[in-house]
UniProtKB/Swiss-Prot annotation:
<dbReference type="InterPro" id="IPR036388">
    <property type="entry name" value="WH-like_DNA-bd_sf"/>
</dbReference>
<dbReference type="InterPro" id="IPR023730">
    <property type="entry name" value="Tscrpt_reg_NanR"/>
</dbReference>
<dbReference type="InterPro" id="IPR011711">
    <property type="entry name" value="GntR_C"/>
</dbReference>
<dbReference type="GO" id="GO:0045892">
    <property type="term" value="P:negative regulation of DNA-templated transcription"/>
</dbReference>
<dbReference type="InterPro" id="IPR008920">
    <property type="entry name" value="TF_FadR/GntR_C"/>
</dbReference>
<keyword id="KW-0805">Transcription regulation</keyword>
<dbReference type="GO" id="GO:0003677">
    <property type="term" value="F:DNA binding"/>
</dbReference>
<comment type="function">
    <text>Transcriptional repressor that controls expression of the genes required for the catabolism of sialic acids.</text>
</comment>
<dbReference type="InterPro" id="IPR000524">
    <property type="entry name" value="Tscrpt_reg_HTH_GntR"/>
</dbReference>
<feature type="DNA-binding region" description="H-T-H motif">
    <location>
        <begin position="58"/>
        <end position="77"/>
    </location>
</feature>
<dbReference type="Pfam" id="PF07729">
    <property type="entry name" value="FCD"/>
</dbReference>
<keyword id="KW-0804">Transcription</keyword>
<feature type="region of interest" description="Disordered">
    <location>
        <begin position="1"/>
        <end position="22"/>
    </location>
</feature>
<keyword id="KW-0238">DNA-binding</keyword>
<dbReference type="InterPro" id="IPR036390">
    <property type="entry name" value="WH_DNA-bd_sf"/>
</dbReference>
<protein>
    <recommendedName>
        <fullName>HTH-type transcriptional repressor NanR</fullName>
    </recommendedName>
</protein>
<dbReference type="GO" id="GO:0003700">
    <property type="term" value="F:DNA-binding transcription factor activity"/>
</dbReference>
Amino acid sequence: MGLMNAFDSQTEDSSPAIGRNLRSRPLARKKLSEMVEEELEQMIRRREFGEGEQLPSERELMAFFNVGRPSVREALAALKRKGLVQINNGERARVSRPSADTIIGEFSGMAKDFLSHPGGIAHFEQLRLFFESSLVRYAAEHATDEQIDLLAKALEINSQSLDNNAAFIRSDVDFHRVLAEIPGNPIFMAIHVALLDWLIAARPTVADQALHEHNNVSYQQHIAIVDAIRRHDPDEADRALQSHLNSVSATWHAFGQTTNKKK
């Protein structure tokens, strides 16, 4: 017996009840800008406008859709957020291809809001741990000599920045970025950059002196990660990475507790 359509189980007696429910919940009307946005998006996806091609002018779009300038501008702004068009001052919108950065950027506001909730930072730190664990195992198994050299160079810059907290944070981010680049997947890179940006932005402000010891510990842990990758030992690389990120998490949690007590 085939699957029954959901409507087949409804009896005639239920029609008045359905009607009452529909009348009590009127359908929301779409804004004109949303309708223009959807139509333009479909035209772009159907290749009616190719990548790099300019869309019609605002005036032409207003006439074509029979809407005002605000609706056209709102629609174009929405398409820009989706990465489907680029808009430069004084020029018509130009069709573009969404990048991994654009896709991740759409979640940025929600991510920052989630981080501000209780437990939010811990959840994102766990996500980072799971994600970088896979990256470091891949690096230990597949990294080329050239890629390992890039890790070693990032490690050297790390060592030169130990007494300068701002520089060390940059070198720390760059070290992990090199790890994320090894698979050659742009989506991995976008996720990794966003994760670190979100987590770093959520960290408390800490006095420079308090960070110096943390910098040295992180640097030594980076050495252990690179050594394991150089030996092509994924298990040891994973252990070193997990030890490092758990240490970072515990340190910043302690900094946060201290900061809260002072308030």
